């Protein structure tokens, strides 16, 4: 109740404070604790930190959002794209997901599969690829991090209680990293409070096994060997978004392991399956400057 009142007050303050200013809106209506999706709110702020008026969706009224510019940056948010959208690295969750309307501008998309969807709808889309979450090391990299865990396990939030995850967690060499951030406190979002702590935990792992796309993307951005895993059939869109991302860095057949079937859980075997991915197909510094020029 109190939180709802505080959010409403924040909305009113945003209306008053930003009269006459050009604002852009980011994120979904609900507060998203999924680390990857939450970066869709936080990264635009990092990219625009000294300049402007970027407001989270939850802190503006519906009439503001529907009239203003919205940024679709991180995550499978193609279905949220409308005529007021600027697409900066967003992707599709499946080949069936379509934009609501032709966006105001497409700067980049997550990968070539997302681009194909825009082209199939008769919308021009540049062959500029990259999930902006890959840029996080340009804003923060832990110094003198100690590798405390042999394997970091990052299941997608729908896989948290999957049998394969529970079995892996019995291995003392495996450290579970929750892709869901702690609950928000007041008006400060979890991503503001914990984004560096999550990266610290990630970088303390020698390698990473993940069914979360952003678990893979962020580990690879920090040059940690990874293995894409499947623990269930519950992830919306199946392999589509993973292949979209991997094709953006010129990996056509990424290593993959299916834990729905019985697999050898020996630590050395699992470590041998992880590989260090080359993400140099995307010039991160140049990509950062491109997104900054838009915001």
Question: What do the predicted segments below correspond to?
Answer:
Residues 1-295:
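Active-site anion-handling motifs in enzyme catalytic cores
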């Amino acid at each position: 109740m109190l939180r709802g009142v505080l959010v409403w007050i924040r909305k009113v303050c945003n209306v008053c404070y930003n009269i006459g200013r050009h604002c852009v809106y980011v994120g979904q209506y609900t507060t998203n604790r999924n680390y990857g999706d939450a970066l869709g709110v936080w990264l635009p702020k990092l990219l625009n930190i000294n300049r402007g008026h970027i407001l989270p969706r939850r802190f503006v009224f519906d009439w503001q959002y529907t009239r203003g510019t919205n940024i679709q940056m991180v995550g499978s948010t193609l279905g949220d794209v409308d005529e007021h959208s600027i697409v900066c690295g967003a992707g599709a969750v499946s080949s069936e997901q379509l934009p609501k309307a032709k966006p105001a501008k497409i700067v980049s998309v997550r990968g070539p599969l997302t681009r194909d969807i825009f082209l199939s709808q008769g919308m021009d889309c540049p062959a500029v690829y990259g999930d902006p979450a890959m840029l996080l090391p340009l804003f923060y990299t832990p110094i003198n991090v100690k590798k405390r865990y042999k394997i970091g396990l990052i299941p997608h939030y729908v896989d948290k209680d999957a049998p394969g995850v529970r079995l892996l967690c019995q291995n003392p060499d495996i450290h579970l990293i929750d892709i869901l951030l702690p609950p928000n406190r007041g008006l400060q979002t979890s991503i503001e409070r914990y984004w560096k702590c999550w990266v610290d935990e990630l970088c303390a792992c020698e390698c990473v096994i993940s069914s979360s796309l952003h678990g893979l993307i962020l580990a690879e951005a920090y040059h940690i060997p990874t293995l894409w895993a499947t623990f269930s059939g519950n992830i919306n869109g199946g392999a589509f978004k993973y292949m979209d991302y991997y094709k953006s860095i010129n990996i056509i057949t990424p290593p993959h392991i299916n834990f729905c079937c019985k697999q050898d859980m020996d630590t050395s075997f699992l470590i041998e399956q992880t590989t260090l991915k080359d993400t140099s197909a995307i010039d991160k510094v140049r990509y950062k400057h491109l997104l900054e020029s838009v915001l």
